[in-house]
């Protein structure tokens, strides 16, 4: 009697998405918000570290080009010693004695923006600074600034940047350990040493990920350059696939959307190859937002694989076969799908929403060992119940930067234990998407046997609820699109006149690309804090205004008015506590 066949291993692809929008004013070059460099020293550094210390672990990373542009820009600022980020410049200022009231206000307003439970409260000296601020602020906003000495501001700046340091740095860097131990009365030398360290951390990030890729331990993919929602650039009505009858912008379409989408894709491919010495074969569409036309556009540009959310898959299966009821998730989720128009094709991986969201939203509340045990048991259950001769493929896809501030120690123990558990599990194999594609295209050269399904129809949507409700469909979001549409009409007309030089045209195109990013529309929602909405509302209108300036056209009066008047009213009715202020972390939009 033959022994029972060993079931094929479960293949897990963990895919971390890294993104920050462009926080620069492209006319002045100044950074309006500091989140890119703060996430760099905390999350991008830690995420590389966990792969570096566990050589058996495998993962994929998506880096949006505009994020990498900013990281390189920060590195250049440190080299030139000309810092264009106001908060970072204050950390590196020779002395804080005699700084302006505006600079003092920036320090006080900025340096408590974090997740207080995990990033402020654990540090007694930092928490004491917050308590002093709370007492001083009771005398009134204008007067309170007079109570803060240069020493207080120095300590606050140092502690804020220490709190934002990655856990791997806190544990292994002697300077950071000594500053945390010192706790207070930081002198100018302490502050400047920390400033220098930040420059070193940022400058080493891209080389670290490149080295991991060259070792074959990770795959790095890209995103259309400024993170636009491709399906909406192509057709607003794609919204109706998942949101029938939803309100749309007054403009019927975004003029020249296809050409703009291609520009974002090609720009991403070019910059990625320049940075990592290889052309990316994978592309994460911003927010996992796909439509049939968007997918084919990527395929035409040579993209071999992409990914989206589970909701898009279920909606697409219904659209492909409306009369067939969906059965168990095991029957349709744990395999990639091929999408084709008969000429071009692309492989699409679909996110296991339940497992991905547990990492993103649930496991932070659990002890790391319990969380890892739960995750592995879920995978073991999928493996045990997958009664097919092929390897089941589980795609865990999530934000690689914003979840960790909710975890103890920035997710240090969770990530360390997760990678160890998966890398050493006898029935689980950590793989990249390209390895799975190889198993599909050249099975004779692969260790794996992967079945690739066919998906005749795509229901346009994103990884957030399977729809575009986070970026379009509400009054404020639609107004945001209409403002962009009108700016694009002016852009097209101005370029046709021939009155702009080649350099001026390039500056205008770069500024337009910033305005086309998805983040402005995400933040125009009442599910985010009023302070967050106001901050991004102002930055979006500032970017649109800058576009008109570069086009040498008058700025429309409506760009002086907040898009979300309700948020403005909320801010006018009272101060928002620092603990509620934005820390670069987005919330999910509402289900439509």
Residue ranges and their predicted role:
Residues 236-250, 256, 261-270, 275-279, ...:
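Non-catalytic regulatory/linker segments of enzymes
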Residues 6-179, 322-591:
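Active-site and substrate-binding clefts of carbohydrate-active enzymes
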Residues 32, 41-44, 186-209, 493-494, ...:
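Short linear interaction motifs
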Residues 229-232, 241-259, 264-265, 311-317, ...:
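Positively charged, amphipathic and often flexible ligand-engagement surfaces
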Residues 191, 198-214, 224, 251-254, ...:
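Gly/Pro-rich turn-and-neighbor structural signature
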Residues 23-33, 73-81, 184-190, 235-248:
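Surface-exposed, active-site-proximal loop segments in enzymatic domains
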Residues 62-67, 224-227, 282-290, 434-437:
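Short, solvent-exposed turn/loop segments enriched in Gly/Ser/Thr/Pro and often Arg
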Residues 164, 196-227, 234-237, 241:
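Structured, charged N-terminal subsegments at the starts of enzyme catalytic cores
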